[in-house]
């Protein structure tokens, strides 16, 4: 009887073994494929014009990188830092407004746009990115300037402001990554070894643009031409690598614990309907930075300066104007 029972159970055990073997094989194949994508395969770059439509592109070489930037206008200097995956084209509405009475330097930091890092081992962490901003300002002869930063590079601006307060006149933070709290799910995925590398290589223009739309409430402002202009430099191998490196190496505790040491007059701008970095952080950030001002832009998303350029430009020009008593109505 026991022998008959054993014979009946053998097919079941064989099925379990075959199933487990198949699952292990499929898992091994998936890991191998992901590893090849992450560390071997290199997607093609999309070719396109490198010239900024704002003004003539300029380049300056430093020990860190060959920085791509534009210089527009005349007056007290302002440095503009684009957010992650964007480049200085994002400030196409801001630059003309500020250039009326400022010298505006819009610069692609390492990982942005058409700046090229010289060192393949550049870490893209906060100390490295802060040092890169310092190198750029030194290279173009700026001992001191106001700094405007968006999103991911808001953390860089804050790091620079507390480390070198004598070099920051005024500080504007637009939906910055600044508080040591949970990142959004996509950014958390990029922090996982091999997954982040594979994700950034598998991103296509269509996938990128689909995700980028989440940064806008007024999505008609993200025209096909603008979306393509953002994608072209992002498809560069160095910028794909920077995507996961900057997120994975980002230690927001370095920024969070020094917020009370920011001495520059600071303006915090945030889109009311930001789904990338939640707008509740605006009030918290404002309470942590001494003497800062906070304005939440109604009906705007994460790319607040593109979603509502009229409102943002008004606040920027009022805050940065050479006559500090100027106010907007």
Which role does the model predict for each range below?
Residues 63, 70-72, 109-148, 152, ...:
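Active-site loop/oxyanion-hole signature of alpha/beta-hydrolase fold enzymes
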Residues 162, 170-199:
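Flexible "cap/lid" loop of the alpha/beta hydrolase fold
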Residues 273-277:
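Acidic catalytic loop of the alpha/beta-hydrolase fold
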Residues 292-329:
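Catalytic active-site module of serine/aspartate enzymes centered on a nucleophile-bearing elbow/loop
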Residues 262, 268-270:
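Short beta-strand/loop motif that positions the catalytic acidic residue
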Residues 72-114:
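Conserved HGGG/HGGXW glycine-rich cap/lid loop of the alpha/beta-hydrolase fold
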Residues 48, 183-188, 202-261:
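Conserved alpha/beta-hydrolase catalytic His-Asp/Glu region
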Residues 1-76, 101-102, 142-143, 321-329:
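Alpha/beta-hydrolase fold catalytic core
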